[in-house]
């Protein structure tokens, strides 16, 4: 922690005090000054084991506004499967924490595990009584997210997929809300009571 603070302070000081360093206009755009290498496009600081690249031109992220309505999801089901219970527990904690940080309601349940057994010969050229049995246990976790917009779902899914641990698979099922098509008429059961009332009179 202290080392990170020292390097952060050093980087800020170099960034603010970069006006004091002179950049010579030689064949290359790199100048050497007291063990520091400076470039016009990138400020590069070198110590014995420290390399800090600080971009000179920081661009602000652009926000785009589109006229299209955002996609609405009624439910987003994320099924995660793996072979190690501790890894799944840790990933479940991470995914729930990320969902709560984004203000998404999440429910977690654990489907029953699946066990596959293979009984094989110990070697190809051996008698049948010499066998070995292999067992694969697949554990599952299911995260149910409800009432999401398309942009929130995309951000959340990209975040948890980038941090997916090794040996863990993910399956995502999306249930989208859509408007009722115009070609579908009114339900038949709304018109039936009126016809029955007319036939009685």
From Swiss-Prot:
Taxonomic superkingdom: Eukaryota
Q: Where in the cell is it found?
A: Mitochondrion
Alphabetized Gene3D superfamilies for the sequence = Ribosomal protein S10 domain
Pfam families named in the record = Ribosomal_S10
Q: Is the keyword Ribosomal protein in the record?
A: yes
Q: Which GO terms describe its cellular component?
A: mitochondrial inner membrane; mitochondrial small ribosomal subunit; mitochondrion
Q: Which InterPro entries match?
A: Ribosomal_uS10_dom, Ribosomal_uS10_dom_sf, Ribosomal_uS10m
Q: Which UniProt keywords apply?
A: Mitochondrion, Ribonucleoprotein, Ribosomal protein
- Family label: Belongs to the universal ribosomal protein uS10 family.
* Subunit relationships: Component of the mitochondrial ribosome small subunit (28S) which comprises a 12S rRNA and about 30 distinct proteins.
The name this protein carries in UniProt is Small ribosomal subunit protein uS10m
Organism, scientific name: Bos taurus
């Amino acid at each position: 922690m202290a080392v990170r603070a020292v390097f952060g302070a050093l980087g800020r000081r170099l960034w603010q005090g970069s006006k004091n360093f002179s950049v010579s206009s030689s064949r290359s755009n790199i100048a050497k000054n007291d063990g520091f290498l400076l470039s016009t496009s990138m400020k590069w600081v070198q110590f014995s084991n420290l390399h800090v690249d600080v971009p000179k031109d920081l661009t602000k992220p652009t926000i785009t506004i589109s006229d299209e309505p955002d996609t609405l999801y009624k439910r987003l089901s994320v099924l995660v499967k793996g072979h190690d219970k501790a890894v799944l527990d840790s990933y479940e904690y991470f995914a729930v924490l990320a969902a709560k940080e984004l203000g998404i309601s999440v429910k977690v349940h654990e489907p029953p595990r699946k066990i596959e057994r293979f009984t094989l010969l110990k070697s190809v050229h051996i008698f049948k009584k010499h066998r070995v049995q292999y067992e694969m246990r697949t554990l599952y976790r299911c995260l149910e997210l409800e009432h999401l917009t398309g942009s929130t779902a995309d951000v959340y899914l990209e975040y948890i997929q980038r941090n997916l641990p090794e040996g863990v698979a993910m399956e995502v099922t999306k249930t989208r809300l859509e408007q009722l098509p115009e070609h579908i008429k009114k339900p038949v059961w709304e018109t039936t009571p009126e016809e029955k009332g007319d036939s009685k009179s």
